[in-house]
Amino acid sequence: MAGSGWGLPRLDGFILTERLGSGTYATVYKAYAKKATREVVAIKCVAKKSLNKASVENLLTEIEILKGIRHPHIVQLKDFQWDNDNIYLIMEFCAGGDLSRFIHTRRILPEKVARVFMQQLASALQFLHERNISHLDLKPQNILLSSLEKPHLKLADFGFAQHMSPWDEKHVLRGSPLYMAPEMVCRRQYDARVDLWSVGVILYEALFGQPPFASRSFSELEEKIRSNRVIELPLRPQLSLDCRDLLQRLLERDPSHRISFQDFFAHPWVDLEHMPSGESLAQATALVVEAVKKDQEGDAAAALSLYCKALDFFVPALHYEVDAQRKEAIKAKVGQYVSRAEELKAIVSSSNQALLRQGTTGQELLREMARDKPRLLAALEVASAAMAKEEEAGKEQDALDLYQHSLGELLLLLAAEAPGRRRELLHTEVQNLMARAEYLKEQIKIRESHWEAESLDKEGLSESVRSSCTLQ
């Protein structure tokens, strides 16, 4: 091995080409392996003379953590070498640049795109959390993209990372101020939950175009960090309720009120359950077996629900599958299940309309008994608006939002209602509305899977999947 001299560094076994970027103590180059494979890699070149004690510790931590982990959404450390002048980290090459550039060239990301990226980032963080590793410098510049064509996120730059149990506390200031949790600045005392705040800032920037503490000066930034004001979300662009809920819970200034790691990983907007994986096909197949059984028993509603849940796993299974022949086989099966779902949808839709007509008398009586309860009457009016909205084509999400708003009120009123006929009617109405909302939610999940359904779009199936799993 030889040092860099005045040109590009030289490293045995590799040809270094263009410079990709540079940081405080390292420069990253694109390189090719001299082997027959001509593998493309990124080489992080750290000049020994630039290292102080803290940067040596950071570098050793990065090597220690990365050499022991393998995950599809974490940049892989392939090897490391050194000579008299430099230390070289030979890394997986990510051709798509970083997430910061990706966001800013598009100004903002659609919610559906941000959701897929967040799912991938959450998967990487779950993997690290299970090993008590905290990144401590999460920001878009440290999140790389595998390519610009169907990019996958790759978490990088573990220089500040630490082995931290959830109850461990640190006092050393680490990270970038725009993405740094308030407790790191205000208290100089923090734990693993700072990564959750940073995730919230990244998501906020992806959806709104800039971080919540974007400032023109450092003093303005410090004032915003030290403020006690609640982080307010812009009204535009319009986001789903689940997305706004997650953002607000991530961006809690007080870490004791911030969403927990387990609740973050389980959050419905993150939806780790439906990430493309080697298990996706097996999960889809198991649900289809249950669907066929219910279908044979004549339970059309249960069968349709199970077919739709199965399709929720077939879409990521198609994304995960790389073998063309197996992909075609999966596609053929999906076509069969879509056809059967279409038939079941007609049966269930007809049945639901009949049930709604049957329930009209009870609903009208409940409204009569709610005349002296303006709050109850208002909540029932919202429920009626939800039912009307559900009848409009393409308004399923609006209907679900109204159902959820109505149920939020009705459940509180039900808990406070005294025993009697009105309570019985209210209980029945709540059960009916919850069933409608839950069923509608299942159908919307397929419609919301934009990127996951992209492969199906090309194969002409996604519209069939979406329409089959949505009752009109």
Swiss-Prot record:
Localization (cell): Cytoplasm
Post-translational modification: Autophosphorylated. Autophosphorylation is blocked by interaction with SUFU.
Main localisation: cytoplasm
InterPro entries: Atg1-like (IPR045269), Kinase-like_dom_sf (IPR011009), MIT_dom (IPR007330), MIT_dom_sf (IPR036181), Prot_kinase_dom (IPR000719), Protein_kinase_ATP_BS (IPR017441), Ser/Thr_kinase_AS (IPR008271)
Binding site for ATP: 20-28, 44
The keyword Acetylation belongs to this UniProt entry's keyword annotation: no
UniProtKB keywords: ATP-binding, Autophagy, Cytoplasm, Kinase, Nucleotide-binding, Phosphoprotein, Repeat, Serine/threonine-protein kinase, Transferase
Annotated Gene Ontology cellular component terms: autophagosome; cytoplasm; cytosol; phagophore assembly site; phagophore assembly site membrane
Catalytic reaction list: L-seryl-[protein] + ATP = O-phospho-L-seryl-[protein] + ADP + H(+); L-threonyl-[protein] + ATP = O-phospho-L-threonyl-[protein] + ADP + H(+)
Organism superkingdom: Eukaryota
Active-site residues, as the UniProt record annotates them: 137 (proton acceptor)
SMART domains: MIT (SM00745), S_TKc (SM00220)
Modified positions (Phosphoserine) in chain numbering: 176, 350, 384, 464
Leading EC class: transferase
GO molecular function terms attached to this record: ATP binding; protein serine kinase activity; protein serine/threonine kinase activity
Signal sequence annotation: none
Keyword Thylakoid appears in the UniProt entry: no
MIT domain boundaries: 281-347, 376-444
Function statement: Serine/threonine protein kinase that acts as a regulator of Sonic hedgehog (SHH) signaling and autophagy. Acts as a negative regulator of SHH signaling in the absence of SHH ligand: interacts with SUFU, thereby inactivating the protein kinase activity and preventing phosphorylation of GLI proteins (GLI1, GLI2 and/or GLI3). Positively regulates SHH signaling in the presence of SHH: dissociates from SUFU, autophosphorylates and mediates phosphorylation of GLI2, activating it and promoting its nuclear translocation.
Record-stated family: Belongs to the protein kinase superfamily. Ser/Thr protein kinase family. APG1/unc-51/ULK1 subfamily.
Listed name of the protein: Serine/threonine-protein kinase ULK3
Protein species of origin: Rattus norvegicus
